[in-house]
Design a protein with these regions (language model features):
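Pro/Thr/Ser/Gly-rich low-complexity, intrinsically disordered linker/stalk tracts
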Residues: 40-45, 49-53, 57-96, 135, ...
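N-terminal secretory signal peptides that target proteins for export/translocation
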Residues: 1-9
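Extracellular zinc-dependent metalloprotease catalytic-domain scaffold
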Residues: 164-331, 338-424
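Recognizes extended acidic, P/S/T-rich segments that occur
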Residues: 101-136, 148-149
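Bacterial N-terminal signal peptides
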Residues: 12-24
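Ser/Thr- and Asn-enriched, surface-exposed coil loops between beta-strands
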Residues: 80-88, 122-127, 314-315
């Protein structure tokens, strides 16, 4: 495992080393907006809300249909491994059942219940991902089918244990747009796979809170932009340059961290650094979650960010992915990256941690959308990946090839259908 912090050293570096994308339709990852909000009570820094949208490229052969044209079929979900704070509960379907009532307990005798999981109506599905659990704990679960005449008998008692390792925790919360969807089990399992991948990569003992949605609207209810396939919203803290750089230097733990720190500028390139709430905590700054489910920010907001998949886009939640479908797992990972802290506006006026490692050649920085710009942690000597410089895509993402892509990285500025991949 690695240290989450300077990736924006390793986060940045790990992400492009893991490919993802494919042929047919392509997705351009669009402009990001930075909307200022009030400073949360108890927080040391002013905040804003940052929005990122992924958009379908009409040249790629796929158009996102109107909101009322949802064509995704019911997918069969497979079991996914536990994360540090979640398990996937699964059961056999009962013929004629209208739905199932789920119990989850810390005790095999069910003399106590995990909050909310006592006769929880999970709908007519065959599984549910249970989140916000304790690390390394065993949980017991059972279900009862129900019909119009009432509930049936309990299933056998089953059990699952959360991952006992320490490190990064991503607490996933599922919006009702997911839990009420016929594909809820497949969607939740896909998100759980994403979380498991990230937790296996990063050892920093911090917790990131993300709300996941599957809808045709943004968190505040307005329609997603035409052609949008996915969106992320997250809180951004405006941290004085010296404060952020000092925290970054102090948090060095690996040789990559040391190389990256050695390449930091001797003089400030901007007055403030805009770091996501998760990225700020990764370097031990006071940047708590502060986003509410409606996309607003303020005191007591429980989320670091919100990830929305467009429910009218041709997504597939299981693999292998059909050539005509976009891989939901790849798209979800991209938006998780944004919540964790990746992103750039290629401007010193909106300076982000990623911009600290943006170069045009050895010893020559470039934080503009002109010319060549690439990621390097050794002063530009090694070009790890080129940044996108096209206004049609997100300036914080990787330069992308035409579909089919030879290097289909998760963080590419355009996505292609039919070829899944993951961060690694």
């Amino acid at each position: 495992m690695t240290n989450f912090k300077t990736s924006i050293v390793r986060l940045v570096a790990a992400l492009f080393a893991a490919a993802l994308c494919a042929l047919a339709g392509s997705v351009n990852l669009g402009a990001q907006n930075d909307v200022r909000t009030a400073k949360p009570s108890g927080a040391a820094f002013e905040t804003s809300i940052r929005t990122h949208e992924s958009r379908a490229d009409p040249q790629g052969g796929h158009q996102v249909p109107p909101a009322n044209e949802i064509t995704t079929g019911i997918e069969t979900a497979s079991w996914t491994a536990p994360t540090r704070t979640s398990v996937m509960t699964m059961w056999n379907s009962v013929s004629g059942a209208n739905g199932y009532l789920l119990d989850v307990s810390c005790s095999s005798s069910f003399d106590n219940f995990v909050g909310g999981y006592h006769d929880m109506d999970v709908g007519n599905v065959s599984g549910r991902v249970v989140t916000a659990l304790r690390v390394g704990a065993t949980y017991y679960y059972r279900v009862r089918p129900y019909t119009t005449t009432g509930p049936g008998s309990y299933s056998q008692t089953m059990q699952a244990t959360t991952n006992p390792t320490t490190g990064l925790i991503i607490n996933a919360t599922f919006d009702s747009s997911i839990t009420a969807d016929p594909n809820a089990t497949a969607i939740e399992a896909m998100i759980n796979r994403c979380v498991s991948i990230y937790e296996s990569l990063f050892s920093d003992p911090i917790t990131i809170e993300i709300l996941f949605r599957y809808a045709t609207t943004a968190p505040d209810g307005h329609p997603l932009r035409p052609g949008a396939t996915a969106r992320s919203d997250n809180g951004v803290y405006h941290i004085p340059w010296s404060t952020y750089i000092g925290a970054l230097r102090a948090d060095a733990k690996t040789s990559n961290d040391n190389s990256a720190n050695a390449s930091l500028p001797a003089r400030a390139l901007a007055t403030i650094v805009r770091a996501s709430s998760a990225a700020g905590r990764a370097v031990r700054l006071n940047t708590p979650p502060g986003m509410f489910a409606n996309g607003s920010a303020g005191n007591g907001g429980p989320y670091d960010g919100i990830v929305t998949l467009n429910s009218s886009a041709p997504f597939q939640f299981t693999r292998p992915v059909n050539a005509n479908n976009f891989d939901a797992q790849r798209e979800t990972e991209h938006e998780i990256d944004e919540v964790m802290g990746l992103g750039s506006d290629a401007s010193v006026s909106y300076f982000h941690p990623q911009d600290l490692f943006s170069w045009s050649s050895a010893g020559v920085r470039n934080i503009t959308s002109n010319g060549t710009r690439y990621f390097s942690i050794n002063g530009g000597l090694t070009n790890i990946v080129n940044f996108n410089q096209s206004a049609d895509g997100d300036l914080g993402d990787w330069l992308s090839e035409a579909c089919p892509q030879t290097h289909p990285y998760v963080q590419n500025a355009s996505d292609c259908s039919g070829q899944p991949f993951d961060v690694a």
